[in-house]
Amino acid sequence: EPHPIMIAHGLSHLIPFEHEDLQKWESSLHFGLSPQHFNTIHSETNLCFGGGLDDVWQNQETGQLHIVDYKSTAQLGKEPRQLNESFLNDKWKAAYKRQMEMYQWIMRKKGFDVSSKGYFLYVDGQHINKAGMIDKDQPSKAYMEFNTSIIPYDGRDDWVEDALFNIKELLLNENPPEHAEDCEYAKFLRETQSALKN
């Protein structure tokens, strides 16, 4: 049956998906190579491509599956932004969308009927006008209040296969590519090299 959060967001037609391998799919820290884990072998490149799902919901009307990704935030501004589709527009959140699309692609490769509509279930830690998180009577306990929101996202996974070919080509290349100017890893490496020289 639908979880109360699904009902509260007008998604009572969705229910948690049940599958014997779901726990393995959710275990990204134990990424396994067996077909029971959340991965697929891309036969054209022989790359094992996978990760760890947060959740999968099933549409009771169509039978289609919806990938669900859990996200958390704690907005520090006095006027926090609403958690809606526009909340996903920050440049760095493009990675969230790519992850959703990759997981949709993997589920399809595993033979499931997957909707292009996925959901980001956001929790937003509340701090404005809050006395604090630590329980005064039991200081070994802390509590935090969260607002919740479900943000729909229409994914497009048509880029994934080309990306896998590009990854394979890069792995076989004897020379690494140059870092992009805004690459955080490149900045880190440059600063590390500079610090080591001094």
Predicted feature locations:
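Metal-dependent nuclease catalytic cores that hydrolyze phosphodiester bonds in DNA/RNA
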Residues: E1-E61, T192-N198
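Residue-level signal for well-ordered alpha-helical scaffold segments within enzymatic catalytic domains
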Residues: A8, D55, H66, M102-K109, ...
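Short, charged/polar micro-motifs that form catalytic or ligand-binding hotspots
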Residues: H42, N46, S86-K97, N173-P176
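Short, mixed charged/polar active-site loops
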Residues: C48-G50, G63-L65, K141-T148
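Conserved catalytic cores of phosphodiester-cleaving nucleases, focusing on short active-site segments
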Residues: G51-S86, Y103
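Short histidine-centered catalytic/ligand-binding loop motif
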Residues: L76-A94, T148-Y153
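Metal-dependent nuclease catalytic cores in nucleic-acid-processing enzymes
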Residues: L88-G118
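Metal-dependent nuclease catalytic regions and adjoining charged, substrate-binding loops involved
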Residues: I106-N198
